[in-house]
């Protein structure tokens, strides 16, 4: 009879997760396995595109999304269990080196014709959806801002044909360094990583009137995979939440 270890070696738990969760889920997977769980095979990408892959028949054990809607949709379609919020994030602005911008001047700078505003791709990637929510808030402060930002925003990441970064690099760091964008709207966790990689790049907080929060949810797609439900519980455990906090996310238990 094959041992549990050899069975795990033959049948790893497959986890699909949002790209912004790469560092956190990779760390959690290693911790989960070292604590006696099966090895974890991860696939990272835009949440909307991962959800489409599941709808077309792919079966990860667990799907962790950068929003609530994609896992909820799978649950409504009968393709997974319920969606459970496990972390929160926020939208920040990543400023390229030499771009003079503060939280107070952010909206005015983004509206300037010469400033290139980068975003992810709406519907394919929740980060893009959150950017457009910010544009809607901007319109309430400055009528016409939505139309301007909607027209000028450069959808540089999160799409089916979006460029991939070199191994070990943040795509946001690459795009900012190449000046594909002067200001990039992305998750604060992504912006912080990119700023660490790019000399002179800065993370700019988004003012409260424009602030957009992001709730991350997971769902068990295939409970028959070894450790699927255990991994979901591990993400929600004290250790899992500690790892998320270390990567800049707000744990679900935080006030």
Model-derived regions: residue spans:
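N-terminal signal peptide c-region/cleavage motif recognized by signal peptidases
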Residues: 2-6
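Exported/periplasmic ABC-transporter solute-binding proteins
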Residues: 8-58, 65-68, 72-76, 87-89, ...
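Periplasmic N-terminal soluble interaction domains immediately after the signal peptide in Gram-negative
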Residues: 81-82
């Amino acid at each position: 009879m094959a041992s549990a270890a050899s069975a795990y070696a033959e049948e790893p738990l497959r986890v699909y997760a949002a790209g912004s969760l790469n560092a956190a889920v990779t760390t959690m997977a290693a911790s989960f396995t070292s604590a006696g769980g099966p090895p974890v095979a991860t696939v990272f990408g835009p949440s909307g595109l991962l959800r489409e892959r599941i709808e077309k028949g792919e079966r990860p054990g667990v799907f962790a999304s950068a929003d609530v809607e994609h896992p909820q949709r799978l649950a409504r379609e009968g393709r997974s269990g319920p969606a459970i919020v496990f972390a929160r994030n926020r939208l920040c602005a990543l400023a390229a080196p030499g771009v003079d911008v503060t939280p107070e001047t952010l909206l005015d700078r983004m509206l300037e014709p010469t400033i290139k505003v980068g975003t992810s791709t709406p519907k394919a990637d929740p980060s893009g959806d959150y950017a457009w929510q910010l544009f809607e808030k901007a319109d309430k402060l400055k009528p016409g801002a939505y139309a301007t930002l909607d027209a000028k925003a450069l959808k540089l990441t999160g799409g089916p044909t979006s460029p991939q970064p070199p191994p070990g690099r943040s795509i946001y760091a690459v795009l900012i360094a190449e000046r594909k964008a002067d200001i990039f709207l992305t998750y604060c966790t992504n912006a912080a990583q990119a700023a660490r990689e790019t000399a002179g790049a800065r993370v700019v907080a988004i003012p409260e009137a424009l602030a957009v929060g992001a709730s991350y949810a997971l769902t068990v797609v295939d409970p028959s995979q070894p450790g699927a439900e255990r991994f979901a519980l591990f993400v929600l455990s004290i250790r899992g939440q500690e790892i998320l906090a270390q990567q800049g996310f707000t744990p679900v238990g935080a006030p």
